[in-house]
From Swiss-Prot:
Coiled-coil segments: none
Family: Belongs to the cytochrome c oxidase subunit 5C family.
Subcellular location: Mitochondrion inner membrane
Source domain of life: Eukaryota
Keywords (A to Z) from UniProt: Membrane, Mitochondrion, Mitochondrion inner membrane, Transmembrane, Transmembrane helix
Protein name, entry field: Cytochrome c oxidase subunit 5C-2
Mitochondrion recorded as keyword: yes
Function, as annotated: This protein is one of the nuclear-coded polypeptide chains of cytochrome c oxidase, the terminal oxidase in mitochondrial electron transport.
Length: 64
C-alpha cells in the first residue's frame, strides 16, 4: 500500500517588494483619478463664476 508521493508546491509568504509595488501603483492611480476629478470640479466652478461676473447668468430667479 505504499503509494507514490505527490509533489505539492511549497507555499511561500507574501513578497514584501511585490506588495509595496502594487500598493504604490494603486495609490498613484487612485491619487491621479482624484486629482483629475478635482481639476474638473475646479474648472466648472471657475467657468460658473466667470459667467456670473460677465452677467450672462444670475443666481437670482427672475420674477415675471
Amino acid at each position: 500500500m505504499g503509494g507514490g508521493r505527490v509533489a505539492h508546491p511549497v507555499l511561500k509568504g507574501p513578497s514584501v517588494v511585490k506588495e509595496l509595488v502594487i500598493g504604490t501603483v494603486l495609490g498613484l492611480a487612485a491619487g491621479g483619478l482624484w486629482k483629475m476629478h478635482h481639476w474638473n470640479e475646479q474648472r466648472k466652478t471657475r467657468a460658473f463664476y466667470d459667467l456670473l461676473e460677465k452677467g450672462e447668468i444670475s443666481v437670482v430667479v427672475d420674477e415675471e
